[in-house]
Amino acid sequence: MTTYKCIEKGIVVWLTGLPGSGKTTIATRLADLLQKEGYRVEVLDGDWARTTVSEGAGFTREERLRHLKRIAWIARLLARNGVIVICSFVSPYKQARNMVRRIVEEEGIPFLEIYVKASLEEVIRRDPKGLYKKALKGELENFTGITDPYEPPENPQLVLDTESNTIEHNVSYLYSLVKAVIE
């Protein structure tokens, strides 16, 4: 039986950035570190959400807002029960991220907005799912960074530059911030 460290209230760590910037990689590595220490951790990411709780959701502004509202409530419910919730979502609009923050913080749960930064040129080069290639050919509508805007956070708690720094460096930096908040 696994023994968990109990924290009264969890925390929501919200990673935002262009598709392919490294959000999910950072989220899963951070989760591994925290789980090894005995914390209860859940990673919520866009691929998982769009095949489960938001199956069939599209990519218009309205659909994205509705989708992220669902995720915010799931994160809030988990965090109020002592879970560290690491969310990895493009969440391209300032309006959406502010909505998520309000939903989480009205329960008194700490919310960390983390900007996973990579230039458009770099994420096009990486293109792990081939989505930029399709978007540039006009095969995908409302694709963030190509046919739909990404509004970078104005005052994130942390900026993780995945072009200039290694994954290990970025995870370590974020880990230190999370530990400072939960301890």
Swiss-Prot record:
Repeat as UniProt keyword: no
InterPro entries: APS_kinase, P-loop_NTPase, Sulf_AdTrans/APS_kinase
Single Gene Ontology BP annotation: sulfate assimilation via adenylyl sulfate reduction
Active site: S91 (phosphoserine intermediate)
EC identifiers of the protein: 2.7.1.25
Gene Ontology molecular function: adenylylsulfate kinase activity; ATP binding; sulfate adenylyltransferase (ATP) activity
Binding-site residues, ATP: G17, L18, P19, G20, S21, G22, K23, T24
Function recorded in the entry: Catalyzes the synthesis of activated sulfate.
NCBIfam families listed in its UniProt record: apsK, PRK03846.1, PRK05541.1
Official protein name in the record: Probable adenylyl-sulfate kinase
Biological source species: Aeropyrum pernix (strain ATCC 700893 / DSM 11879 / JCM 9820 / NBRC 100138 / K1)
